[in-house]
């Protein structure tokens, strides 16, 4: 069952030092999501979405990378007929409709989806300890 209010999502294969307190208590009226975006890493140089001057995400322009963390309104997925689906497709539709906002993160972020990137993150964290 879906919650009645926006909820936090975060990918299990990412690491970031983002302060979740920066997220709003609720989404602005009509918005279906807010994604935490960061500079593009070497393995994803083209990014995902481009924030405009009002932080509304667009499919064109200078793109940033989605960190895997954000807030989603349950209406975003409420009517998706499939029990298993790609969030990217749902995100693209909402972005195309101007219903997603961005908040930029310039701190540490790492996609640890490969052994190599996980190893690099572990080395970085060990050095900073």
Task: Go through the PLM ranges and name each one.
Residues 33-34, 100:
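Hydrophobic/aromatic residues located in beta-strands of well-ordered beta-sheets
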Residues 34-48:
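Short beta-strand-to-loop element that shapes/binds the nucleotide-sugar donor at the catalytic cleft/hinge
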Residues 7-8, 15, 20-28, 40-43, ...:
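Catalytic-core segments of class I nucleotidyltransferases/pyrophosphorylases
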Residues 50-55:
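Short acidic-glycine loop/turn motifs at beta-strand connectors
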Residues 9-11, 35:
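Short catalytic-loop micro-motif centered on adjacent basic/acidic residues
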Residues 6, 32-33:
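Short, Asp-centered acidic motifs that coordinate Mg2+ and/or phosphate
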